Amino acid sequence: MYKPVFTLLCIFLLQVSQAQPRRARGMGISIGVLPPGRFNAITDVAGVTVGQTTIIRADSVRTGVTVILPHSGNIFQNKVPAAIYVGNGFGKLAGTTQVKELGNLETPVVLTNTLGVATGIEALIDYTLQQNGNEAVQSVNAVVGETNDGYLNDIRGRHVKKSDVLLALKTAAGGPVQEGAVGAGTGTVCFGFKGGIGTASRKLPQKLGGYTVGVLVQTNFGGVLQIDGVPVGEELNKYYLGDQLNNPVDGSCMMVVATDAPLDSRNLERLAKRAFMGLAKTGGIASNGSGDYVIAFSTDSLLRSPHQSREPKESIHALRNDEMSPLFMAAIEATEEAIINSLLMAQTITGKGGRKVEALPAEKVAGILKKYNRLK
């Protein structure tokens, strides 16, 4: 008499198992030729931590915060070399000009929605001023990026609060990073499917330095989806200018690139440009209304800039230009895979006004990739 119950339980467990999203490599998709790090995440770069706050309330609040910390110390007092590359500048990335001028980061990076940027700035200022050793600080270059999640989220309600940002900063950790419709990716849309947060990494061989490049993305853009060179968007008949795609192509993509390679700001900008090439490989087109930005930084401790240093000169031990090509390839591969992970890990969400954005249909995608002999 227990057989019907047991059978129903098995069916339920099978359905749950089938419904669980899988990352690209979990599906047999192997993008590029370089191996990933242990977690295949930006946190494979030693010292980098990620924190997220997901805000889902009632029928219309679908937003959140994602933060990336370059190291566990006082970032203002020990600034890291950094660069920003603007692929298409229809966005509101706060802190850009000082990073470009001075070549460093002095705060964590915050990602949120467009109308939450000011809140992110206030939270980063509070966070910085409250740290020991910063009692005399009177200027903070808060770096806050955004995408517009207003299709699914009541963005005008400005539901992201300082406490949400501070919570993400407080709970930031290393190890695996949650992906999909979480944090700053809770309400985003990508290629007409549910977008979100994605991450990936690449590890160079020891003979090339053994360096790690990690990428985290917040995907909210459009185009013609490609996965590992396969025209998935066309096969699904859902793409920019296609008859079946109702969602507009305009959106944004924030890309954060971390590396432990000793790079100065000039070569970090060169690295950032390669991340944009990774976006292009997924079929993104950097449309007119898209804010596509790359923030790149190095965690190398010997390249940090002490805020209180009295030394008139700095010694530079950065990599030579000739050593950059393997890192370029790593950035391209990791960015491409991070974007695909953001799609595969996101689940269907219904939000503001009853709007529903479907997840990328993983089983159909697997079938398409098999057709093109791209599954391993």
Where are these regions (language model features)?
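Bacterial Sec-dependent N-terminal signal peptides
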Residues: M1-P21
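Alpha/propeptide regions of enzymes that mature by internal proteolysis
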Residues: Q20-K376
